[in-house]
Curated annotation (Swiss-Prot):
Residues 200-390 form the DH domain. Phosphorylation at Ser-1120 and Ser-1147 by RPS6KA3 create YWHAB and YWHAE binding sites and which contribute to the negative regulation of EGF-induced MAPK1/3 phosphorylation. Residues 444-548 form the PH domain. It comes from Mus musculus (Mouse). Promotes the exchange of Ras-bound GDP by GTP. Probably by promoting Ras activation, regulates phosphorylation of MAP kinase MAPK3 in response to EGF. Catalytic component of a trimeric complex that participates in transduction of signals from Ras to Rac by promoting the Rac-specific guanine nucleotide exchange factor (GEF) activity. GO terms for molecular function: epidermal growth factor receptor binding; guanyl-nucleotide exchange factor activity; molecular condensate scaffold activity; protein heterodimerization activity; protein kinase binding; SH3 domain binding. This is Son of sevenless homolog 1. One of its GO terms (biological process) is lymphocyte homeostasis. The lineage of its organism: Eukaryota, Metazoa, Chordata, Craniata, Vertebrata. Residues 780-1019 form the Ras-GEF domain.
Length: 1319
């Protein structure tokens, strides 16, 4: 028995695990009920759980045996009126329990645990009663905190928010912290600093929207809490009495709600290209309707001289005080002192309108909006002059600021100012002890002088929301050096939640007095100098004491109204979009925190997606953008327009049988309900349908250009829309359509103005107009790069998101669906082939070296112009099979240009890590490499299912579309900035008409290129053939510096190797295997074969060029060793390296014919850029450690790159990010050279083609020079592959004397690193 009587410890080590987390899921559900647009983090819900368990402990201490015992405990322990509401909820729960479970908290589990807590079996009904009380208090806490969070314009409830909000709520503080002296809340300095500086137009609009929402809540408080008791008791207060006190407050409330709705609609419908929301028309329309006139008559009534006397006379009527006291504790005092101050708030708010309109007119960047503001200001001149005249007579005498009339805290307007004020006050008080003011208060209310009855001297009072500080003035200067110079000396301080305010009538001893009653029964009486001063102090003190009670009264009233006036929707049979949400038609993301409190859709039916696209409760602009970008993958444009029209045409709900009987009797039961339905459902839905239409024609007009019938239907639909609220949106859509039609008929117009003039066109040997002489060596390399950059920039900027979604560029209708993307693919492939052709058709070695050198100069200018697509085109050409094998040519390329080429190749290594870092570090304009986007889109499309199945229903996987839209959004962010360069029409035309293949088929052309390569540099180790010169003009390059640099002309962006401080690639770990911008992971496809070995470490998608990522494929004569290889530990177990495609075993032939590989024809667009097969473990072309032969040229070239765009792969490889490797013995039908890809090191090698040549051997590199030593390199930190190690031996220079004394490298040889150490 003794053990049972010991108090139960909820938070002990033994019991805490039983309760921890028990209530959190239910609390999350409760929070969703009271504030559906907010989110709560786990810490916040766990803190609420602790509070509820604390409350449960308090209820269980009374050892309840029946519901009446619990009720009695609640009445004794809970503050009024929360006890009354909690009991009412509990009783309701017991009654409903017989029919269904109305509770969110787990009543059954709590009932089971209560037997252990109490030590005896408790009746189930008592448990339900207790749980209902707990749920009510939890809802009350979350409702209070949610209001605070919305007030500070946040979207997530945190633990700190709960502490701050509860600290300002006397009711909850009394309940949970009755015996705690003071509660420490974090200082406001932890919050983000307040923004200082000049506000923009959009800042003003956002601030005003938040302010008017709070203002509307104040009006609701006046009307629903204070005015309602006067209206409901016609015996005490006549309608004339109510009119005299509250004047036209209802009209003002209606105007405020209408104004907020107009502004919200305008902000929602604002075009992305607009500088800011154009809210001028909102004020102009209402001003022309004379909607602001009630403010003038209201101010006249409230500020008339006899108003206060009449107001007090109403309260002094017989029975009035008793009636008001019966409504709630302190309600009579709140009416007497708080209501008069609240009634002044509309006056100050109206005066604020006039100031706001002037500020908005000044900040507006739109001429039409400025004109609307002027018209609104002019229309309000009469109201403004009348208001100012009334206020100048009355408000000046009252000496009240606007903040004094505010019921709700405005601390977030200037938190830093509040902190500064608190700190200044505390420093000015001598003898301060205890915690700082800022640790127990959030807001400074007021200060002034009061007389404490019985004291000799006056007290200077500082009133905060949590403290009342009474000080005595320090008279005279300090006598001793170092003594405090504070102006005040602390006498006493009162915690506002621990005191009771009592009004005192005037007596002979004191006048204008009030009493502060402490919890221990002692009291202090203060008197003011006048009745007006007393009213000011009482208004502030009563507001602090009863603010939470009044807010709860408002919330209860609003909730009750919502229950009584539930909006009735049409039946789902009549209106398909009225079907309730369920798991069979819509799913939401569970682990994603929405930023604006709007749920994020994971999947849904088309109808549900359209419903949420035009939802009546909130707007979701991100969803609108994503939907219009991706909808074509699951819905045709004609179907979308039909659904939008169906959504727009909303039928009104049919009357019930009771409604029909009432109508027959002459009543109008549906009038109020229909009015609400039209206002809260029909109007917002129709506006959002128009908003979707406007976005559609503005940003996706190509849908209408491809289908004239679609455009005609849209225009007919817009023409049928009626209603004043819709007028300006209809006009906006009509203007957009007309503008788009004109642009379509006249062609694209470019009217771009640059800050500086573009640079002059550079010429070399060829001259303007002589297009027949244009060639790689006759045109200036700077101008070739510039004109190609302009051309590729135009092609890149022309690609629309719809050409990418659903991988439509790989589908049957690609010419229709992806015309601009295919143009870019074809241009890039043609340019790459042209570079290859220029090189291999130049037979003479000296001229060929000049051609390669000129191409590298073009690459250098590409880098300076941030044309990454062009850079990778050049790299691809240099890495192609016909060019890659030209060893003798690359030997004569200057080392500086080799370094430039190697650095360019490094952009594609390690999953394009350096390219992505470079792209993020530069400023537009630029031409990004498109292939990486297409790869990411293809992986996302193919790695995620089109639909999700739930309960036998198929839901559109919108999460997948959202990921694709994020990629297209990244593409679009680089499409806005054009180049400040001058178009040279002839050069542009020359490159637009490039056709290196002529009439040849691609297989035939690639065979020709490779055979030509073999002709100019044969495989056999014999003297290089001599060829006559092809060109009669000088081969010397004009260089890559502009010939006429002028001040103010465009300077090329700094090339990669010249800006090590912007981005140092040496600081990027080469060992990382994941790209920083890899595509979203997707599920493994069921047909994907597992890796051949668990030792594979490079299965990610890699370079588009299929060349060695760890060593340069170029012909560097420096002793460069792969930085990847060198990073391996020396104690690693030697593992045979994967077989490089360029190496052949002794028994295998050395060459493969390209004619056996290429099988695609020119009728399908070629892909860009071509690529080489690559692997992380490929050895460098001239590696120190594995090149043992000094006689043989390099091995046979890599596999030829395909020229086709990607076909949708059937399945992916073991990782969802990889394309499936080709089957054994069959060449992969790449068709997707435009996509970065890397074969697995364990992919079976391609079939070998017999060759008459012998075994290939490796050529050694020249010796490592002192300048190239790792510790002596003084240049920028890129590229890392130029690093060397002291462990690498120095080898003799390469010679071309053919010797067959060295063994060739076999597939089972040791890795590079081990070779290096062993040699």
């Amino acid at each position: 028995m003794q053990a049972q009587q010991l108090p139960y410890e909820f938070f002990s080590e033994e019991n805490a695990p039983k309760w921890r987390g028990l209530l959190v899921p239910a609390l999350k559900k409760v929070q969703g009920q009271v504030h559906p647009t907010l989110e709560s983090n786990d810490d916040a819900l766990q803190y609420v759980e602790e509070l509820i368990l604390q409350l449960l402990n308090m209820l269980c201490q009374a050892q309840p045996r029946s519901a009446s015992d619990v009720e009695e405990r609640v009445q004794k322990s809970f503050p009024h009126p929360i006890d009354k509401w909690a009991i009412a909820d509990a009783q309701s729960a017991i009654e409903k329990r017989k029919r269904r479970n109305p509770l969110s908290l787990p009543a059954e589990r709590i009932h089971h645990l209560l037997r252990e807590v109490l030590g005896y079996k408790i009746d189930h009904q008592v448990s339900v009663y207790i749980v209902a009380v707990l749920e009510y208090i939890s809802a009350d806490i979350l409702k209070l905190v949610g209001n605070y969070v919305r007030n500070i314009r946040h979207y997530e409830i945190t633990k700190q928010d709960i502490k701050v909000a509860m600290c300002a709520d006397k009711v909850l503080m009394d309940m949970f912290h009755q015996d705690v002296e003071d509660i420490n809340i974090l200082s406001l300095t932890d919050e983000e600093p307040s923004t200082s500086g000049e506000q923009t137009y959009y800042d003003l609009v956002k601030a005003f929207m938040a302010e008017i929402r709070q203002y509307i809540r104040e009006l609701n408080l006046i009307i629903k809490v204070f005015r309602e008791p006067f209206v409901s008791n016609s015996k005490l207060f006549s309608s004339n009495d109510v009119e005299n006190i509250f004047s036209r407050i209802v009209d003002i409330h209606e105007l405020s709600v209408k104004l907020l709705g107009h502004i919200e609609d305008t902000v929602e419908m604002t075009d992305e290209g607009s500088p800011h929301p154009l809210v001028g028309s909102c004020f102009e329309d209402l001003a022309e309707e004379l909607a602001f006139d009630p403010y003038e008559s209201y101010a006249r009534d409230i500020l008339r001289p006899g108003f206060h006397g009449h107001f007090l006379s109403q309260l002094s009527k017989p029975g009035a005080a008793l009636y008001l006291q019966s409504i709630g504790e302190g309600f009579k005092e709140a009416v007497q002192y708080v209501l008069p101050r609240l009634l002044l708030a509309p006056v100050y708010h109206c005066l604020h309108y006039f100031e706001l309109l002037k500020q908005l007119e000044e900040k507006s960047e739109d001429q039409e909006d400025k004109e609307c503001m002027k018209q609104a200001i002019t229309a309000l001149l009469n109201v403004q002059s009348g208001m100012e005249k009334i206020c100048s007579k009355s408000l000046a005498k009252r000496r009240l600021s606007e903040s004094a009339c505010r019921f709700y805290s405005q601390q977030m307007k200037g938190k830093q100012l509040a902190i500064k004020k608190m700190n200044e006050i505390q420093k000015n008080i001598d003898g301060w002890e205890g915690k700082d003011i800022g640790q127990c208060c959030n807001e400074f209310i007021m200060e002034g002088t009061l007389t404490r009855v019985g004291a000799k001297h006056e007290r200077h009072i500082f009133l905060f929301d949590g403290l009342m500080i009474c000080c005595k003035s320090n008279h005279g200067q300090p006598r001793l050096p170092g003594a405090s110079s504070a102006e005040y000396r602390l006498k006493e301080k009162f915690f506002m939640r621990k005191v009771q305010i009592n009004d005192k009538d005037d007596t002979s001893e004191y006048k204008h007095a009030f009493e502060i009653i402490l919890k221990d029964g002692n009291s202090v009486i203060f008197s003011a100098k006048s009745a007006e001063e007393k009213n000011n102090w009482m208004a502030a003190l009563i507001s602090l004491q009863y603010r939470s009670t009044l807010e709860r009264m408002l919330d209860v009233t609003v909730l009750q109204e919502e229950k009584e006036e539930q909006m009735r929707l049409p039946s789902a049979e009549v209106y398909r979009f009225a079907e309730p949400d369920s798991e069979e038609n819509i799913l939401f993301e569970e682990n994603v925190q929405p930023k604006a409190g709007i749920p994020i859709i994971k999947a849904g039916t088309v109808l549900k997606l359209i419903e949420r696209l035009t939802y009546h409760m909130y707007a979701d602009p991100n969803f609108v953008r994503t939907f219009l970008t991706t909808y074509r993958s699951f819905c045709r444009p004609q179907e979308l327009l039909s659904l939008l029209i169906e959504r727009f045409e909303i039928p009104e709900p049919e009357p019930t049988e009771a409604d029909r009987i009432a109508i027959e009797n002459g009543d109008q039961p549906l009038s109020a309900e229909l009015k609400r339905f039209r206002k809260e459902y029909i109007q917002p839905v129709q506006l959002r349908v128009l908003n979707v239409c406007r976005h559609w024609v503005e940003h996706h007009f190509y849908d209408f250009e491809r289908d004239a019938d679609l455009l005609q239907r849209m225009e007919e639909f817009i023409g049928t829309v009626r209603g004043k609220a819709m007028k300006k949106w209809v006009e906006s859509i009509t203007k957009i359509i007309q503008r788009k039609k004109i642009a379509r008929d006249n062609g694209p117009g470019h009217n771009i103005t640059f800050q500086s003039s573009p640079p002059t066109v550079e010429w070399h040997i060829s001259r303007p107009g002589h297009i027949e002489t244009f060639d790689l060596l006759t045109l200036h390399p700077i101008e070739i790069a510039r004109q190609l950059t302009l051309l590729e920039s135009d092609l890149y900027r022309a690609v629309q998101p719809s050409e990418l979604v659903g991988s439509v560029w790989t589908k049957e209708d690609k010419e229709i669906n992806s015309p601009n993307l295919l143009k870019m693919i074809r241009h890039t492939t043609n340019l790459t082939l042209w570079f290859e052709k220029c090189i291999v058709e130049t037979e003479n070695l000296e001229e060929r070296v000049a051609v390669v050198s000129r191409i590298i100069e073009i690459l250098q200018v590409f880098q300076e112009l941030n044309n990454f697509n062009g850079v990778l085109e050049v790299v691809s050409a240099m890495n192609s099979s016909p060019v890659y094998r030209l060893d003798h040519t690359f030997e004569q390329i200057p080392s500086r240009q080799k370094k430039i080429l190697e650095e360019a190749h490094e952009l594609s290594e390690d999953h394009y890590k350096k390219y992505l870092a470079k792209l993020r570090s530069i400023n537009p304009p630029c031409v990004p490499f498109f292939g990486i986007y297409l790869t990411n889109i293809l992986k996302t499309e193919e790695g995620n299912p089109e639909v999700l199945r739930r309960h036998g229903k198929e839901l559109i996987n919108f999460s997948k579309r959202r990921r694709v839209a994020e990629i297209t959004g990244e593409i679009q962010q680089y499409q806005n900035q054009p180049y400040c360069l001058r178009v040279e029409p002839d050069i542009k035309r020359f490159f637009e008409n490039l056709n290196p293949m002529g009439n040849s088929m691609e297989k035939e052309f690639t065979d020709y290129l490779f055979n030509k390569s073999l002709e100019i540099e044969p495989r056999h180790p014999k003297p290089l053939p001599r060829f006559p010169k092809k060109y009669s003009y000088p081969l010397k390059s004009p260089g890559v510096r502009p010939s006429n640099p002028r001040p103010g002309t465009m300077r090329h962006p700094t090339p990669l190797q010249q800006e090590p401080r912007k981005i140092s690639y040496s600081r990027i770990p080469e060992s990382e295997t994941e790209s920083t911008a890899s595509a979203p992971n997707s599920p493994r496809t069921p047909l994907t074969p597992p890796p051949a070995s668990g030792t594979s470490s490079n299965t990610d998608v890699c370079s588009v060029f299929d060349s060695d990522h760890s060593a340069s494929p170029f012909h560097s004569r420096s002793a460069s060793v792969s930085s990847i290889s060198l990073s391996k530990g020396t104690d690693e177990v030697p593992v045979p390296p994967p077989v490089p495609p360029r190496r052949r075993p002794e028994s295998a032939p050395a060459e493969s014919s390209p004619s056996k590989i290429m099988s695609k024809h020119l009728d399908s667009p070629p892909a860009i850029p071509p690529r080489q097969p690559t692997s992380k473990a490929y050895s460098p072309r001239y590696s120190i450690s594995d090149r043992t032969s000094i006689s043989d040229p390099p091995e046979s070239p890599p596999l030829l790159p395909p020229r086709e765009p990607v076909r949708t792969p059937d399945v992916f490889s073991s990782s969802p990010l990889h394309l499936q490797p080709p089957p054994l013995g069959k060449k992969s039908d790449h068709g997707n050279a435009f996509f970065p890809n890397s074969p697995s090191p364990f992919t079976p090698p391609p079939p070998q083609t017999p060759s008459p040549h012998g075994t290939r051997r490796h050529l050694p590199s020249p010796p490592l020079t002192q300048e190239m030593d790792l510790h002596s390199i003084a240049g920028p930190p890129v590229p890392p592959r130029q690093s060397t190690s002291q462990l690498i031996p120095k080898l003799p220079p390469k010679t071309y004397k053919r010797e067959h004394t060295h063994p060739s490298m076999h597939r089972d040889g040791p890795p590079l690193l081990e070779n290096a150490h062993s040699s």
